[in-house]
A protein has these predicted regions:
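Inter-repeat boundary and helix-capping residues of tandem alpha-helical solenoids
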Residues: 2-3, 40-47, 88, 127-130, ...
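Conserved alpha-helical positions within TPR/SEL1-like repeat arrays
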Residues: 10-18, 48-63, 89-104, 131-146, ...
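Amphipathic alpha-helical segments of tetratricopeptide repeats
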Residues: 33-41, 78-83, 119-124, 161-166, ...
Length: 294
């Protein structure tokens, strides 16, 4: 199903936003909405133009952190779009914007059903926009994980993984990220063995496409180390932590917080294994490295 009708011009508004001229962008978007409401067209054509103008206004309000206004604009746009087949694409985009707005403002439970609807809309387009739907399902899975609904989270992660792997190929960062997310889900749910398998899959992909010394590789190694400790393979866990820390130390200017967090986990493991001298030695090293950033 394709969109129809002549759209409200959005490029001037987007250009103003890109230039940081937010007040002018808001004024232009508001004027476009007033024009759409007052024009002579009637029925579906008028509603289409108002819907598009509301979408643009909502985007501007969101950029300006006018959260209440943005939500109201998106919801009014969705109400006008209704269930019209010719506005399926517009409806999908409005729902996506509304879902992410709610999600990023700590209203995850409100965002979840909107994500569900948006993903279904993108999948129903002709041709389907499966990749966007998969990205939305990944976000939705993160919400369900946070809400403790692990089975639902797994369902959406696996659907996301299947689509992204099919459309983008196995050797892509997007696929590696979903494997990492699934591993995190399994770990949180208490399935460390399964988590370890997922983390390893993500590591294999990241090493191949990013190289062995990339900071995302360090993230995978840290996750693997944590899972190894949980299953009792502490010696391997130490080695993975140490490799991750070498990578992060080389990139400490950009990854100081990650270096400190992983270093703390490494120290905790050393202390749990009664290797206090090694723990103390690394603590001093980490403090010295971090002090160079002050």
């Amino acid at each position: 199903v394709s969109d129809t009708a002549n759209p409200i011009p959005t490029q001037p508004v987007l250009s103003l936003l890109a230039e940081g001229r937010h007040d002018e962008a808001l004024k232009a978007a508001t004027a476009a909405l007033v024009e759409a409401r007052n024009e002579g067209a009637e029925g579906d054509e008028r509603n289409t133009r108002i819907c598009q103008a509301l979408h643009t206004l909502g985007d501007v309000q969101r950029e300006m952190e006018q959260i209440v206004g943005a939500e109201a604009s998106y919801r009014e746009g969705l109400e006008l779009a209704g269930d019209r087949p010719d506005l399926l694409g517009e409806r999908a985009r409005l729902r996506m914007q509304l879902a992410t707005l709610l999600d990023f403002n700590q209203r995850e439970a409100d965002a979840a059903p909107v994500y569900e609807q948006a993903a279904a809309d993108f999948e129903a387009l002709t041709p389907p926009d499966d990749v966007t739907a998969a990205q939305l399902r990944n976000n939705l899975a993160m919400i369900y994980k946070g809400l403790g609904k692990f089975a639902l989270a797994e369902q959406h992660y696996l659907r996301s993984l299947e689509t992204i792997e099919l459309r983008m190929g196995r050797e892509s960062e997007a696929v590696a990220s979903v494997y990492n997310n699934i591993g995190s889900l399994y770990y949180t749910a208490g399935f460390a063995d399964e988590a370890l398998k997922m983390f390893k899959e993500g590591l294999i992909i990241r090493e191949k496409i990013l190289g062995p010394d990339h900071t995302d590789v360090a993230q995978s190694l840290s996750n693997i180390a944590t899972a190894r400790h949980e299953v009792g393979d502490n010696m391997s866990a130490l080695l993975d932590f140490e490799r991750a820390l070498r990578i992060l130390e080389e990139n400490v200017k950009e990854k100081a917080s990650s270096y400190e967090a992983v270093g703390g986990d490494y120290i905790s493991l050393l202390e749990a294994l009664h290797q206090e001298r090694r723990a103390e030695a690394f603590q001093k090293r980490m403090q010295k490295v971090l002090s160079t950033l002050a």
